[in-house]
Regions:
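N-terminal intrinsically disordered, low-complexity, charge/repeat-rich segments that act as generic
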Residues: 1-101
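Acidic-enriched, low-complexity/disordered segments with a strong bias for Aspartate over Glutamate
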Residues: 6, 49, 78, 110-113, ...
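Short, basic/aromatic beta-hairpin or loop at an interaction surface
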Residues: 103-119
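Basic/aromatic-rich interaction segments and small domains that mediate binding to polyanionic partners
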Residues: 10-37, 79, 83, 122-137, ...
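Generic detector of short, locally flexible boundary/turn motifs and exposed helical patches
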Residues: 2-3, 41-43, 101-106, 125-129, ...
Length: 207
């Protein structure tokens, strides 16, 4: 989608000032926000690309007014409500007022280390061959999807060169669809993944 999360090339937002020696977390609550996101992701009620889509779908003013983990937490709440795991009232009050949903997979304390080490690999097996070859010139699709995409807006329609063939992976643009329902079989559809190099002048002009 063409949202404020895709800020590459946008003007009027000022320079980026990297924080020297930036900590992983700026406040204790951010640790909890990440832990909640990981724990709820283990329920299997959504996948990582659906969660990214939820973050990107926040209203622009709200998105721009939030910190990184505030965005994570708000999107997590929205996903939990959409799956009827909690109610909006429970999110506001911080107290459970309805019985827990039965049959939902949970991440127990003793399984956390193994789950984090295992991760969520996106590589899939295939008998097909890559469509493109190293050094081949390709043009990025000129498109304006309503959902999540990993193709930045500023490269769409531009010509680049294949410099990496990175394997056969789940396609985020496909697996993020239908974010208001649990992932179906189509979420596991794979495509070849390429690294494409674009020249600066191709993207931004001679300046």
């Amino acid at each position: 989608m063409n949202g404020v999360h895709d800020m590459g090339g946008l003007q009027c937002f000022g320079p980026v000032h990297p924080e020297p020696h930036e900590p992983l977390f700026h406040a204790p609550w951010e640790r909890h926000a990440m832990a909640l996101t990981v724990a709820m992701g283990a329920t299997g009620q959504w996948n990582i690309d659906q969660m990214r889509s939820a973050r990107e779908s926040l209203p622009p003013a709200q998105y721009l007014g939030m910190s990184y983990y505030q965005i994570w937490l708000k999107a997590l709440q929205d996903m939990m409500v959409s799956r009827q795991l909690v109610t909006a009232h429970e999110c506001r009050e911080g107290q459970m007022s309805t019985p827990p949903v039965a049959g939902v997979r949970t991440l127990t304390r003793d399984a956390v280390d193994a789950a984090l080490k295992r991760g969520s690999p996106a590589v899939r097996e295939t008998s097909s061959q890559p469509v493109f070859t190293l050094g081949q010139r390709v043009r990025a699709r000129l498109m304006h999807p309503s959902g999540h995409t990993r193709l930045p807006r500023y490269v769409r329609g531009h010509v680049g060169t294949i410099h990496l063939i990175q394997g056969f992976h789940v396609c985020p643009d496909i697996s993020s669809r239908h974010r208001h329902q649990a992932p179906g079989p189509e979420a596991d559809v794979g495509q070849w993944l390429y690294g494409v190099r674009f020249e600066g002048a191709e993207l931004w002009g001679p300046q």
